Regions:
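Structured alpha-helical segments in the cores of large, soluble enzyme domains
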Residues: 12-32, 65-67
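Active-site beta-loop-alpha junctions enriched in small/polar residues
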Residues: 43-47, 78-85
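Structural preference for beta-strand elements that scaffold enzyme active sites
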Residues: 37-39, 74-79
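Conserved, mostly hydrophobic/aromatic
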Residues: 40, 106
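Single conserved hydrophobic/aromatic residue that forms the stacking wall/gate
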Residues: 1-9
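A C-terminal functional module that forms or caps the active site or interfaces directly
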Residues: 55-68
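Short glycine/threonine-rich loop-to-helix capping motif typified by GTGT followed
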Residues: 47-58, 88-93
Length: 121
């Protein structure tokens, strides 16, 4: 049985490099990881709940992938939290298209970010 491991990382090149080294160390053991990989969550703790930080974080991750072939192979995707309108609201505020959970990028910023990321890739 090959083991799988989950870790929480931040968005920096150094954190991705440290994770890569951690996975390499694990793979040198007698029980290596089945498929070392990471999907970076650009929101939540990485953004400090500041939804617009997802834009910078996403671009930083792509930059890290361009700087290192090993990081490029390790990173399988980004998780960007978006909704129709920017931000969030409390339950009962009745603002159409705004999240009632975590703050999100609105549709327009999400669409722009996806196009920018495609150009960077």
């Amino acid at each position: 049985i090959r083991r799988q491991r989950q870790m929480c990382i931040r968005d920096s090149y150094e954190d991705l490099q440290n994770l890569l080294e951690h996975y390499e160390d694990a793979n040198s053991s007698s029980n290596p990881l089945a498929n070392p990989a990471v999907i970076v969550d650009a929101n939540h703790s990485n953004s400090g709940k500041k939804f617009e930080e997802q834009i910078r974080i996403s671009k930083d991750v792509l930059h890290s992938c361009k700087m290192s072939a090993d990081i490029h192979k390790l990173v399988k995707g980004l998780m960007i939290e978006s909704y129709i309108e920017d931000g969030n609201q409390k339950v009962g505020e009745h603002c159409y298209g705004k999240s009632i959970t975590d703050p999100c990028l609105g549709w327009e910023k999400t669409e722009k970010l996806i196009y920018e990321l495609a150009e960077l890739w």
